């Protein structure tokens, strides 16, 4: 069956809840699950946060949020035209919802060597929690 907003699926040992992110481009879903250690992880999908998804995001311990570029470089990369967010956008959301851990992914790759430092530096202006900016194939202990 095709997914619907709020559907649950058992994947490995996890009860995964899928939610429609209300994309204006194409139908897309995020998901939320509780890890074996009791922590809640939410993946917002490949577009900016939509407030109608709040019940899936609020009270999570880990938020995976796309952050296409630094806010200070938004005029260069034009993330909003591509239906994407900036580091500032993701960090302000995580701060407002008091989410302790934020994973920023789906970033532009013009400065991979400096990306983590730059994204964390900008992010800390808007967010007091833990910021992770993984490289491809990185592992993060949840």
Spans of model-derived segments:
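Core dinuclear metal-dependent hydrolase active-site scaffold
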Residues: 2-55, 136-142
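Cap/insert and terminal regions of metallo-dependent hydrolase folds
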Residues: 48-137
């Amino acid at each position: 069956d095709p997914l619907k907003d709020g559907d649950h699926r058992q994947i490995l040992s996890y009860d995964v809840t899928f939610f429609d992110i209300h994309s204006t481009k194409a139908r897309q879903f995020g998901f939320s699950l509780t890890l074996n250690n009791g922590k809640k992880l939410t993946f917002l999908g490949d577009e900016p946060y939509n407030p109608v998804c709040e019940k899936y995001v609020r009270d999570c311990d880990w938020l995976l949020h796309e952050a296409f570029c630094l806010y200070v470089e938004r005029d260069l990369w034009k993330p909003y035209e591509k239906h994407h967010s900036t580091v500032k956008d993701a960090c302000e959301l995580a701060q407002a919802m008091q989410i302790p851990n934020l994973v920023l992914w789906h970033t532009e790759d013009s400065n991979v060597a400096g990306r983590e430092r730059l994204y964390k530096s900008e992010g800390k202006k808007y967010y007091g929690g833990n910021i992770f900016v993984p490289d491809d194939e990185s592992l993060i202990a949840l």
